[in-house]
């Protein structure tokens, strides 16, 4: 793929790989924010917000395109990949066509941007990433999201371990073998490259690298990659938070009393926990300074706001406006969070594992303590609710399951990650909890109430100070979950959903049965590889 010749600079190498003569276009490597702002403002719908953040528009695609994710079927990785709906196969011929198509487009641009940076804060495991793109906003986004090298590290950067070719403004050819749309996000583990066509959504770069880490870390280093946030308390106790979008993973890990290790992507090694990223990618819908001050105040010069609506006169962002997308986002360096732990790693192993779910059925309790087998079951299940209202005709929230709380990003079979997690929890004596940040008293559609954030934070405080581990518990039928009878700062009537159900315990039993059936049906695809103890840890109808 790449010429064997040794080049003096990364810019020279990129010119050679794209077949460009010297001076045909401008290549900016690791450009500062000010330069990227200047270039970005030439693009349509780009502006500077009242707080100094760069406002950018990602075009037609305002979210990831998981059905267009491809992994090249090649001999060095094929036997390890979890093939199926998550990881669709692309032939090596298709890869070559798409890579050349991306190169053809990139060589026509006026400016190209290179971002050389790292994935992984632990120097023992970090990999060198090179981003090649043609939108300044993409370059600033990845400058924020990757770990920025020092001047000395950049001078000695050398060859990257993995390269992303982002030609997202240009579509894939739908007549190419294996293409189902004009979008493709394609990873080749033999070439150690990724190609993006047909989507300008910046999150595709971030999550593509996440998939690479989900493959390389377990396979090459026996290091567990996790879709989680992490923080560390004053006593050096580490907590991991697992949860799908909208469950509160980013919000709850940003705690003024604890140091933030990271908000989304981590690895758990024999030496502790480290963040994969150098930034945060927070959801902005409904954001306010009162509810989430650390995130709100991080939106300033150097940050990237994506697909938000703003007042064209004052440039004040309306975080309640979802007319472009519900998936409004902001990407900022992790140093913008005052409580961030820099470097973003801990030599301490997690003492608490928190599985977050936003249960719109109202069935699951605000908090329950999990056995090791229940952790395996609920980690593999990865349950939450996809909320109604974002699609025409959808009137009921939908139960959704995402194995390991990160199914779209997994490279290996979920049981591989679940087994590694169970082994590490056992080795380091970690406690595990299931927290429902969703509805209580009834379902979303039948008058239930969202569990207030202040109560969820009180629950976390009781986990971190050790009092919840010493509490008295009762068992929730069917799911077999252990529920505390009292938590300081939380009304006792909220803790047991059966006793709190507005329509009475009889109606609650019906709701439990309905949700339990969905869990059981979902788990069937993993049952043949799970132990009998793990299967029994699920709901018993």
UniProtKB/Swiss-Prot annotation:
Does this entry carry the keyword Lyase?
A: yes
**InterPro entries found in the cross-reference section:** PEP_carboxykinase_ATP, PEP_carboxykinase_C, PEP_carboxykinase_N, PEPCK_ATP_CS
Listed binding positions for ATP are 243-250
Please state the pathway this protein functions in, per its UniProt record. Carbohydrate biosynthesis; gluconeogenesis
- Keyword Nucleotide-binding present in the record's keywords: the answer is yes
Q: Which residues form the signal peptide?
A: none
Give the record's GO CC terms: cytosol
EC number(s) reported in the record: 4.1.1.49
The cross-references to PROSITE patterns, in alphabetical order and at most eight, read: PEPCK_ATP (PS00532)
Tell me, which GO biological process terms does this entry list?
gluconeogenesis
Q: Which reaction does it catalyse?
A: oxaloacetate + ATP = phosphoenolpyruvate + ADP + CO2
EC class: lyase
Q: Which UniProt keywords apply?
A: ATP-binding, Decarboxylase, Gluconeogenesis, Lyase, Nucleotide-binding
- Please name the GO terms that the record assigns under molecular function: ATP binding; phosphoenolpyruvate carboxykinase (ATP) activity
NCBIfam families in UniProt? pckA, PRK09344.1-2, PRK09344.1-3
Q: Which family does it belong to?
A: Belongs to the phosphoenolpyruvate carboxykinase (ATP) family.
Q: What is this protein called?
A: Phosphoenolpyruvate carboxykinase (ATP)
Question: Which species is this UniProt entry from?
Answer: Eremothecium gossypii (strain ATCC 10895 / CBS 109.51 / FGSC 9923 / NRRL Y-1056)
């Amino acid at each position: 793929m790449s010429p064997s010749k040794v080049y003096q600079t990364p810019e020279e190498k990129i010119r050679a790989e794209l077949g460009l003569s010297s001076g045909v276009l401008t290549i900016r490597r690791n450009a500062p924010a000010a330069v990227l702002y200047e270039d970005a403002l030439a693009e349509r719908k780009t502006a500077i917000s009242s707080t100094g953040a760069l406002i950018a528009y990602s075009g037609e695609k305002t979210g990831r395109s998981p059905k267009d994710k491809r992994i090249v079927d090649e001999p060095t990785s094929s036997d390890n990949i979890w093939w199926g709906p998550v990881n669709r196969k692309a032939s090596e011929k298709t890869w070559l066509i798409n890579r050349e198509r991306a190169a053809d487009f990139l060589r026509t641009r006026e400016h190209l941007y290179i971002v050389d940076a790292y994935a992984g804060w632990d120097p023992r495991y970090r990999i060198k990433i090179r981003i090649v793109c043609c939108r300044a906003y993409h370059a600033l986004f990845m400058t924020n999201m990757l770990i920025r090298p020092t001047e000395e590290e950049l001078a000695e950067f050398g060859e990257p371990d993995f390269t992303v070719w982002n030609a997202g403004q240009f579509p894939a050819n739908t007549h190419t073998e294996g293409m189902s749309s004009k979008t493709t996000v394609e990873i080749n583990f033999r070439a150690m490259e990724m190609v993006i066509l047909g989507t300008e959504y910046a999150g595709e770069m971030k999550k593509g690298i996440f998939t690479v880490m989900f493959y390389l870390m377990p396979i090459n280093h026996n290091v567990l990659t996790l879709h989680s946030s992490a923080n560390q308390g004053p006593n050096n106790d580490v907590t991991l938070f697992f949860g799908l979008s909208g469950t509160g993973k980013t919000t709850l890990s940003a705690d003024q009393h604890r140091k933030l290790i990271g908000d989304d992507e981590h690895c758990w090694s024999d030496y502790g926990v480290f963040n994969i990223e150098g930034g945060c990618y927070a959801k902005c819908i409904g954001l306010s300074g009162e509810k989430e001050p650390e995130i709100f105040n991080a939106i300033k010069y150097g940050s990237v706001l994506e697909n938000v609506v703003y007042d064209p006169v004052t440039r004040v962002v309306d975080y309640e406006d979802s007319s472009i997308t519900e998936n409004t986002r902001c990407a900022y360096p992790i140093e913008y969070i005052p409580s961030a732990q820099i470097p973003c790693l801990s030599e301490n192993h997690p003492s608490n594992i928190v599985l977050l779910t936003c249960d719109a059925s109202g069935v699951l309790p605000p908090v329950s303590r999990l056995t090791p087998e229940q952790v395996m079951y609920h980690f593999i299940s990865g349950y939450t609710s996809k909320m109604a209202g974002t699609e025409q005709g959808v009137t009921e929230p939908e139960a959704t399951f995402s194995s390991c709380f990160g199914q779209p990003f997994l490279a290996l079979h979920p049981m591989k990650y679940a087994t590694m997690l169970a082994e590490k929890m056992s080795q380091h004596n970690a406690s595990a909890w299931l927290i429902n940040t969703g509805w209580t008293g009834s379902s979303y559609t039948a008058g239930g109430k969202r569990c207030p954030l202040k109560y969820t934070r009180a629950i976390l405080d009781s986990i971190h100070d050790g009092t919840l581990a010493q509490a008295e518990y009762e068992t929730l039928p069917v799911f077999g979950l252990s529920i505390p009878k009292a938590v300081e700062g939380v009304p006792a009537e909220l803790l047991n959903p059966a006793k709190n159900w507005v329509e009475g315990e009889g109606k609650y039993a019906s709701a439990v049965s309905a949700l339990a059936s969905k869990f059981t049906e979902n788990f069937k695809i993993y049952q043949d590889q799970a132990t009998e103890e793990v299967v029994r840890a699920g709901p018993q109808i």
